[in-house]
Amino acid sequence: MQEKTKRIIKEDIEAVRAYSDCFDVEMPDLDENGEVIGLPAPYPREVAGTVRSGYRIYDLAKKAKERGWPIQNPILGRNTAEETYGESQEMYAYADKFDETLFHFVHAEATRHIDPLKGRELINQSRGKGGITPIGEREFIAMGGGSKHPVRINATGDTPHLSIINALIAGFDGTDIGPVIHVHFGGRGIHDYKTKVVNGYKAIQICAENNIFVQLDSHKHLNNIGGTDGMALAMCLLSEGLAVHAGLPWELSAIQMNVAGINIYADLAVMRAFRKACHSKSIIAVPETFQNPPGNLVAEAAHFSRMAVTAKLGGADFYRPKAAESVGIPTGDSMGQAIWGTEDVFGHVVNPDIQSPVIDAREAEIIDEALAVLEATLHLEGLTLEAMTDDFWKQWSDEALIDLIVAAGKAGVLDSQRAAGWDLKRHVVVNRDKDGITRYVKGYTPLGVDASRCAQSDEDVEVHVEKAPTRPEKIVLATVGADAHVNGINVIREAFQDAGYDVVYLRGMNLPESVAEVAAEVGADAVGVSNLLGLGMELFPRVSKRLEELGLRDKMVVCAGGRIAEKEEEHRQFEEKIQKEGSAFMGMDGFFGPGSSPEDCVKIIGDMINAKKA
């Protein structure tokens, strides 16, 4: 019983012990004979008066299919169990208005991204932000969390299997792992790519053996970093191949998908392609990120209603309502209003089962690109969806399949424009065409993949090419803390490079002091740091402090971006403070929040540099 889980614990016992010590929670250990102790029984298992199981979530997916519209999957997790439980009760009150059972996504603390054995310092500087803590997960369930509404925790990062063991002990019905196949948001992380994939596979095995519902992989995250629909489908299918080896029941497997609400035919095509190709029984539709919705909850509701319509028409099993996209973690009341509004959309939109040759053609195009990527990854020819049965994936051992995946990532076969894994080959360039579809720019399709089978843009696209600086000014850019969200700072990097600056780019997850020291070493004129987890007040001043210690603060422009505070109400207070007082209270010369123009950033910081030199 639980043989794979026990084997994984034995193999990674030092990391398990580091997790226990780092987060002050009791974890499984080994007795004097080297056998695992302290591991709870698999689900179904009663925890805090409720029988927990991933099948509670699958039962909701079946309900969605029967009635014809998605179950809502709101995201809400605060730093403590008490806060999370209290805000959740306010959110649940709205669902009670129409007797709806939710699939509650309890967002975890950002430290989940980091290996506790190798990244303790990063963890320590990022505690208490991004969501609920590991000990808070256990306390939340003990308080009654998940008793009516099934819950899942997110476990993305370097060591998802450790987070999932904690969730199993706590009593969460589900979790997420994806993206397994690509580096989450392109962050640097601690590990090499193979370790990332291996740890993802360990997480899948634990879910399979303990009946945990799992969001296996994510079309959404690949889209967010410039992955095409076809590439995302290929990666999700590779994750399903690993799931076959893990023995994961398809009823407990879900794929997360973007819906953009820009082109309904395109959204329907991609949802149908995934439904046709994937064996996972559930699709979780999520409103596309990075569309810069209005910074107002009422106006934002209209923005997200477009995605809710698509989710219903596309037959999603679950849908994540959004509130306060521009400010991080919303209040329970704001999320409750988003749930209420979304349910109104679901209840007043008729699904006419839209059929069109345009949808059919796009669906076929997505599937063909995915098959081309898989052929290049697996060294096959003439691959079809019909051939990809469970037995198909068993022709390789799990180790051999992982080796093929890793080799494809390092060769540029599995590629997306803004992924920044340090040992992955980058080549592709994409364009978001006027019809809302992301396609490759001609000449920049994935390496080793038949270009004729990759959707390519017909638009006139100017490709950003890194070139030698034409100006003497130098700027260091990085995210600080346990933050792997590099999409925004990548855009800023390109803007400064296009303007001729010499850019030193440190990617994601850096200590503030390290950024300052690099700036000193290279003789930078400016430093730009970002954190989207609400750690601005804790981390940004440390950059300036270290520069002061080095005697360089007065010689450098130091600016920041992202979110100063993670919670809706706190972020609003800081925005007002910046408008009245400026950003000096954070030790910054300027702050560029969500929605800032890259061109404005370049101009304003350039003017600041000139003023320093004057």
Curated annotation (Swiss-Prot):
Inhibited by intrinsic factor and iodoacetic acid. Competitively inhibited by itaconate, mesaconate, succinate, 1-methyl-1,2-trans-clycopropane, dicarboxylate and L-malate. Non-competitively inhibited by glutaconate and 1-methyl-1,2-cis-cyclopropanedicarboxylate. Not inhibited by acrylate or by the chelating agents alpha,alpha-dipyridyl or EDTA. Not activated by Fe(2+), Mg(2+), Mn(2+) or Ca(2+). Unaffected by K(+), Na(+), NH4(+), Rb(+) or Li(+). Adenosylcob(III)alamin binds at residue 485. Residues 472-614 form the B12-binding domain. It comes from Eubacterium barkeri. One of its GO terms (biological process) is nicotinate catabolic process. This is 2-methyleneglutarate mutase. It comes from the Bacteria. Contains a mixture of adenosylcobalamin and oxygen-stable cob(II)alamin. Pfam families: B12-binding. Induction: By nicotinate. It is an enzyme of class 5 (isomerase). Activity decreases rapidly below pH 7.5 in phosphate buffer, and below pH 8.0 in Tris buffer. Involved in the fermentation of nicotinate to ammonia, propionate, acetate and carbon dioxide. Keywords: Cobalamin, Cobalt, Isomerase, Metal-binding. One of its GO terms (molecular function) is 2-methyleneglutarate mutase activity. It catalyses: 2-methyleneglutarate = 2-methylene-3-methylsuccinate. Changing residue 464 to Q: No effect on activity. PROSITE patterns: B12_BINDING (PS51332). Its EC number is 5.4.99.4. Its cofactor is adenosylcob(III)alamin; cob(II)alamin.
